[in-house]
From Swiss-Prot:
Subcellular location as annotated: Cell membrane
Gene3D superfamilies (UniProt xref): 1.10.1760.20
GO cellular component, one term: plasma membrane
InterPro entries per record: ECF_substrate-spec-like
Natural source organism: Bacillus cereus (strain ATCC 14579 / DSM 31 / CCUG 7414 / JCM 2152 / NBRC 15305 / NCIMB 9373 / NCTC 2599 / NRRL B-3711)
Membrane topology category: Multi-pass membrane protein
Keywords: Cell membrane, Membrane, Transmembrane, Transmembrane helix
Pfam families named in the record: ECF-ribofla_trS
Name assigned to this protein: Putative UPF0397 protein BC_2624
Length: 87
């Protein structure tokens, strides 16, 4: 298994921070259509640094967005499997 280089770890940190903060904003161009410019950051970083970086940036950045926005961390909360309360 390859180790993560310092360059890749820094790119993941910067990408996740940008994606997490900018993921809070977007704009509507038509009814039921919402565009988030932060998705471009995820696409560019994934193309430049590879799929592992893209996966980690998306996972960490989306968790940051959900936490800052007050929606909370949702993954792993399936009441039928884990008896986890949804409220």
């Amino acid at each position: 298994m390859n180790k993560l280089s310092t360059k890749l770890v820094v790119a993941i940190g910067i990408g996740a921070a940008l994606y997490g903060i900018l993921g809070l904003w977007g704009f509507s161009i038509a009814p039921n259509t919402f565009i988030k410019p932060a998705l471009a950051i995820l696409t560019v970083f994934g193309a430049l640094f590879g799929p592992v970086a893209g996966l980690l940036i998306g996972l960490i950045g989306h968790t940051v967005t959900d936490t800052i926005a007050g929606w909370g961390i949702w993954w792993g909360c399936y009441p039928t499997l884990l008896n986890c309360p949804l409220h």
